[in-house]
Amino acid sequence: MTITLTENKRKSMEKLSVDGVISALAFDQRGALKRMMAQHQTKEPTVEQIEELKSLVSEELTPFASSILLDPEYGLPASRVRSEEAGLLLAYEKTGYDATTTSRLPDCLDVWSAKRIKEAGAEAVKFLLYYDIDGDQDVNEQKKAYIERIGSECRAEDIPFYLEILTYDEKIADNASPEFAKVKAHKVNEAMKVFSKERFGVDVLKVEVPVNMKFVEGFADGEVLFTKEEAAQAFRDQEASTDLPYIYLSAGVSAKLFQDTLVFAAESGAKFNGVLCGRATWAGSVKVYIEEGPQAAREWLRTEGFKNIDELNKVLDKTASPWTEKM
C-alpha cells in the first residue's frame, strides 16, 4: 500500500531527510539529560547549562544530520543555531511519566500545540507514547483517543506527525531484564500495528528495534536468549507490521552496538527509513561539558561526536531505505 502525502507534508518530509533517508539527531531529552548532568556535578543543572549544551550539539553536529529533534522547553535556542540545511522536529510531550502508577498516561506540554510548533519553525510534530499492548484496556483506549487528537491537530495544520512508541509491560519493572527481552518483539510489533491505522494520522513511526540485542547470539556478553535467526524473524515481523515509514531510536545504547544493530536489521529484511539517534551520538559530551566547560565540549563534538555521526551516516547509506518508496 502506498500512502499519499499532501504537498506541504511532502515538502516537510523532504526537508527532514536526505534522499529519502531520515538521519536525524535526537536531543529532546530533558529529565534524562538532567540526570546525566547531575552525575558530574553536585548542584542541580541550570536552564542555562541545558540550553547551552543543546545549542553546542546543534551547532556542531547538524551540518552532518538531515534534521534535529529538540524540545520547546530548552531547545529553542539550539533550533536557531542549527545548520540551514537541517530540518527541525519539536517534541510535544511532557518529559517522563508518573512512576506511582503503571498507566504512564501521555500529556502534552501546557503552552504548546501543533499550531505553535509549526509557528516555531518545525517541519514536524513528534510525540512520545508509552504503550503496553497487553496492559489495561481502559488505559489503552485513553491513549488511543489521545493520539487521535494529536493526529487531527497535525492534519489540520498540515504538518507531519512522528509518533515515538516506547513499549513496556505493566508487570515487569525492568525493560533491560531477560524477562522483558522475551516479550519485546511482541510488544513493539503489535503496538506498531495499532498506530499504523489511518485514524491516528501518523506519518512516521519512531520505534525501538524489536529485540534486545544484548541477548542475541554473537552480540551477547552473557546470557543468550535468541539465536540470530530468531532475532532476524523479529525484524521481518516488524517490517510486516506497518506500511508507514519507520525509523529507529538508539535507546541509549553505545554507538557501536546501534550501528551493528542497523546492519543486522537490514540484513534481516527490515526496510527501515532512518534513525533518530540521540545519546549514542552525543552522550560523551555531557561529562566533558560539566567538568571542562563549553569549549572542551565543542572540541569533543568536533572529534568524537563527529566520528559517531559520520560512522552512523556511513552505516545508514548501506542499510536504510528511502521513505519515498512508501509514500
Swiss-Prot record:
| Residue ranges the record marks as coiled coil | none
The annotated pathway is: Carbohydrate metabolism; D-tagatose 6-phosphate degradation; D-glyceraldehyde 3-phosphate and glycerone phosphate from D-tagatose 6-phosphate: step 2/2
Instruction: Name the UniProt key words of this record, in alphabetical order.
Output: Lactose metabolism, Lyase
Query: By its UniProt entry, which InterPro entries does this protein fall under?
Result: Aldolase_TIM, DeoC/FbaB/LacD_aldolase, LacD_aldolase, Tag_1.6-dipho_adolase
What SMART domains has UniProt attached to this entry?
DeoC
Q: What is its EC number?
A: 4.1.2.40
For this protein, the record's Gene3D superfamilies field holds: Aldolase class I
**UniProt KW Magnesium keyword:** no
The Gene Ontology biological process annotation of the record reads: 6-sulfoquinovose(1-) catabolic process; D-tagatose 6-phosphate catabolic process; lactose catabolic process via tagatose-6-phosphate
Broad EC category: lyase
Asked if the keyword tRNA-binding belongs to this entry, the reply reads no
Q: What's a single GO MF annotation on this record?
A: tagatose-bisphosphate aldolase activity
Pfam families recorded: DeoC
Q: Catalysed reaction per UniProt?
A: D-tagatofuranose 1,6-bisphosphate = D-glyceraldehyde 3-phosphate + dihydroxyacetone phosphate
| Family of this protein | Belongs to the aldolase LacD family.
In Swiss-Prot or TrEMBL terms, this protein is called: Tagatose 1,6-diphosphate aldolase 2
